[in-house]
Amino acid sequence: MFTGIVAAIGSIRQVSPLGEDGVRLDVAAGELDMSDVAIGDSIAIQGACMTVVEKTAEGFAVDVSAESLRRTTGLAGTGPVNLEKAMRLSDRVGGHLVSGHVDGLGVVRRFEPVGESHLLEILAPQALAGFLVYKGSITVDGVSLTVNHVEDLPLAKAVDPAWPEAARAVLAGRGPSVAPAGAPGTAIGAHSGAHAETEPWCCAFQINLIPHTVAQTTLKRLTPGRLVNLEIDTVARYLARMQEVAGKLPAQN
């Protein structure tokens, strides 16, 4: 488990092929304290939980499966990444409980300064919409953040046609997304009712970023149309599953 409080900005220095379309990442740890990290320990890279397979002079190496590469963004090439070591039970939870299991991808719609802060607006696919609530928690590229506004929008209104095809595919339901609960093919987080027979839509949510968060994470590099890793709040995940099975189980004494 993690807290969503980024400990350091590291850098993927090298990406090497590793059987069955996986890769090995050579990561420079930057200011991350590696003194207590052992082979087999977990480190979140851009919000994705990875297992340390080797310690190096500058950091560590991890193996990433083809499935993880398909379900995430930011792990297939070199460049800066957010890093966080797995939490201890004695640690303060400065953000919220984060598993490091990416639920799906989002697309940056806006990232702009507002006074001393920055407004970050992200579009999420329908499968994750039901888990996004006002003042709820969301993990973006490994950073624990608070949602300040949620709005469902038609794709035609929300999506810029100039964005890369990968971004437009994610929002149209053609990209990778994990249904956090429910049977295969069931998007438990999807809204129903008013959206059921209407045009394709997505969920826009806004976040206010304080200067410290911008400075200490890779979020400063975000631009419209860029993909980000999203992990929903664990509590929301369990509530959705409980709602799904309500009425299907016999009454408990």
Task: Label every PLM stretch briefly.
Residues 1-173, 180-181, 190-253:
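Conserved loop->alpha-helix
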